[in-house]
Amino acid sequence: MTLQGSLTHEEYCAALLAETDRLREIVRTADLSATVPTCPDWTLAELARHVGGAHRWTGTIVATRASESVDPADVPGGAGPEDKGAAALDAWLAEGVEQTVAALREAGPDTEVWSWTTARNTGFWARRMVHETVIHRADAALAAGVPFDVPAPVAADCLEEWLQIGELPMVVARFAERGGELLGPGRTIHVHATDAPPGLDAEWLLDLTGAAPAHRRTHEKAAVALRGPLTDVLQVLYRRLPADSDRVEVLGERALLDQWLEWATFG
């Protein structure tokens, strides 16, 4: 099991800047005291501080070539600006992501650093921060009541990363603690993005018939299929959109999809 992405290191760096810019636009224009429906313990301001703190934490890991986890309390500026206003929060987000991207670009994708996975390199962090920002931008868009969409290559890679992380042994073990008989004969899930542009392979089969979850990119019949626009399918898997939304279609054993989503929730 690898955590190989489909974009180049520079494409991840550019996407991280672009996704943060889109988040910042929401921060500048929305009610920062609004509760985030998909993260109900947070206001929009707290969500933005979480994302900006994650950027700076990652930037510190990369810039210092950390060989072990970094205490968030040791990250310069990691707690966010003292000023609670939108302008200060926007400027803090911009400064943090620029510092992090500069560190990622300087390091390149293959520099060894600590991570919580088997992929102990800077390339892992470039990809992870893009998709951390994508999903929390979805949260912010929900809180602000504004549309949410993701460029197709980024959305497909975000979905692929979700499946890859869900197959890591330490993650599978954590999921298994939630109980339930998820694995077994005939338990397969087909995910199909119906609006993928030509050349983008945006169909996956999640195979739950073996000793651990596995996936492959293929068009293949399954016990249940989730179909819809790529951004919407991604949100369903990350539980930012309910599977019974009229924006997606579920065909077959709906209970299996629901069980998987409950079992494999993270992020």
Q: What name fits each language-model region?
A:
Residues H219-G267:
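C-terminal interaction segments
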Residues T194-L230:
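Acidic/His-leaning functional-site neighborhoods
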Residues D31-P72, T117-A176, V233:
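Short, contiguous alpha-helical
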Residues M1-S6:
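Glycine/alanine-rich phosphate-binding loops at beta-alpha junctions
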Residues P72-K84, V154-L168, E253-T265:
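Short, mixed-charge aromatic SLiMs
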Residues W162-L206:
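A glycine-rich beta-turn/hairpin centered on an aromatic-Pro dipeptide
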Residues P81-T111, T122-E132, D139, L182-H190, ...:
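Acidic/histidine-rich alpha-helical segments that form the ligand environment
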Residues E11-P81, G85-A91, E95-G96, T100:
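Active-site-proximal cofactor/substrate-binding loop regions of enzyme domains
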